[in-house]
Amino acid sequence: MNSRRAKIIVDILMVIFLVLSFVRWEASSFAFHAIVGSACTLFFAMHIFIHRKWIKAVTKSCFAGKLNKALRWKYIIDMLLLVVWSVSILTGFIAIIPFLDEAAGISVWGRLHGITARIGLALVVVHVIQHLPQIKSYLGVKKGAKKKS
């Protein structure tokens, strides 16, 4: 499998599992949310691994002061995504413990998990919008191409 195809597959699966993780899990089950969230975490880690060279190069350029404004904003959003989703993932795993004890109710960790997940989702939307040219390129959409009627 080539690199471009791997990127597309990982990104599509990550988005699918991310959307599924926002399904009202009370209607399905906590186990469903935990499994889907864990799968999303796996694809998130794969996404970072696949793009590690870009991350390293842009980080180096950022600290050297060599980034243009647009790339600097992409980098800021990407780093916010990394921090917010890392907190969401960590608090998601910590929040499992009170759920094992039904009397404990929703913990501070569960609330923090929910808040960071929603912030993370908003940042994902911004991230996708910022990277639309690359996404279109991966999907083979030509710039200025019009659909045939």
Task: Label each PLM-derived region with a short phrase.
Residues 1-149:
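Membrane-embedded alpha-helical bundles that constitute the cytochrome b-like, heme-associated redox core
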